[in-house]
Structures are given as structure tokens and as C-alpha cells.
Curated annotation (Swiss-Prot):
Organism name: Arabidopsis thaliana (Mouse-ear cress)
Secretion signal span: 1-22
Hydroxyproline carried by residues: P66, P69
Alphabetical list of InterPro entries matching this protein: CLE1-4
Gene name as annotated: CLE1
GO BP terms, alphabetized: cell-cell signaling involved in cell fate commitment
Keyword field: Developmental protein, Differentiation, Glycoprotein, Hydroxylation, Secreted, Signal
Entry keyword Signal: yes
Sugar-bearing residue positions: N59, P69
Source organism superkingdom: Eukaryota
Protein known as: CLAVATA3/ESR (CLE)-related protein 1
Cellular component, GO annotation: apoplast
PANTHER family linked to this entry: CLAVATA3/ESR (CLE)-RELATED PROTEIN 3, CLAVATA3_ESR (CLE)-RELATED PROTEIN 1
Amino acid sequence: MANLKFLLCLFLICVSLSRSSASRPMFPNADGIKRGRMMIEAEEVLKASMEKLMERGFNESMRLSPGGPDPRHH
């Protein structure tokens, strides 16, 4: 009986492995031909963000000054 269970288990594993190799590819749009609308919009947002960053520069601080000394500092 144990031998039969082992053979059945081995058979099911072999069948599942053979079916997974014949399935469709995991990333059908990997070649870049068809892209989704969300992906295109994300690329546009990223491009606009990079352009804004390049205009402003990398070394400029985005912090705002509080307008005076902080009395609670030190």
C-alpha cells in the first residue's frame, strides 16, 4: 500500500512538472510590444519627475527655513 502511494505521488509530481513546462510564458509582455496603460502613465510620471529633478539640481535642498532661531534648540 505504501509503495502504491509513493508511485502515485511520484506520478503526480511528474505530471505537474510536465504541465508547467508546457504552459504559457510568465511574462507575456516582456518583449515590450504591448504595454498597459498604467505602465505608460507610470513612465510619463517618472520622466516628468526626472526632468524636474534635473532642472532643480541634485545639490539644492528642498527644506524650508523656519524663519528664525528655534528657542528650544540647545
